[in-house]
Amino acid sequence: MTTCPFVAKAALYMERTADWTPVSPLTTVGMWHQALGEISEDVVRLDGLDKDHLRVVYARRFERHLVSVVTNATCFLRDLGVEDPAAAFVAEWERAAIKHPGMTLDCDGPTDEVRFYALAEEVGEVAASLTYDNANSTGHNADTIAEVTQVGALALAWLVRYQGGNERSEDR
């Protein structure tokens, strides 16, 4: 089995957010949607940029939005009673690596567009888990902790591709 590429980053973000006050689920999901809008814009712009100095600027901006998603997922999980969000993110990546070999968001398989859709879908699942009828026959029956964990793990996996404003692969 492949080793999770973001163990150290997950621990770093957990440490950095240790004393943060959690915000409401509404605020978190809203911030994620804002970040998704910025990420989609960055993906489009990065795809059309030929100048290296501009690519670095947008890659760093892109990285900041992914960090925002991760740190908010970390705080949300803590507020939901998860003691070690970093371990939860790593365990989720390990499950995904088995279920989707070569297609976790750190791999070269998916494009940034596909990565975006995967992250957006999971943010939507978190929102679905918070609806009034989630646990009813008319709802999605989504587990909020599991869905928030997937959001954080996906963002971390994608984030390892953008270290210091540089893409790990030209296969976007």
Regions found by a protein language model. Give the residues of each.
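Flexible "arm" and connector segments at domain edges
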Residues: 1-172
